[in-house]
Regions:
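Domain-length accessory/inserted modules outside core catalytic folds
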Residues: 1-114
Length: 114
């Protein structure tokens, strides 16, 4: 399933992630993950189901700051992240990964395609 990944060095890309396999998510992020959602994200994406999956131990591991994630969370996000959506009890790929990527590229100065 296609999703958007944003790295700490401001690179954005479309990647394949099997959201039915937590190991696939861990591989994409680089460790154990947690979900992050804010009202700012819901407003920005015009969709309350959009979430970020971030490295749960990013700060403990002293990973670099993720500027995009930190801006959307309004607090420090350390490490790479991917976007997803919540559907009931499931975490699934975004409806339109390309549109999500384009929206982020137009908003965040310095963000570049990988």
């Amino acid at each position: 399933m296609k999703t958007v990944k944003v790295t700490t060095d401001n690179k954005i890309s479309i990647i394949d992630v099997d959201f039915d396999d937590f190991r696939s998510i861990q591989c994409a992020i680089g460790g154990h993950f947690e979900t992050v959602h804010t009202q700012l994200m819901a407003d920005y994406f015009k969709d309350p189901s959009v979430i970020m999956l971030v490295d749960e131990e990013g700060l403990i591991k002293e990973l670099p700051l993720n500027p995009v994630g930190s801006a959307l969370y309004r607090s420090v996000i350390a490490g790479d992240l991917i976007f997803a959506q919540v559907r009931g009890d499931d975490i699934v790929a975004p409806d339109d990964a390309e549109d999500l990527k384009d929206r982020l590229l137009h908003t965040f100065i310095g963000l570049q395609e990988a």
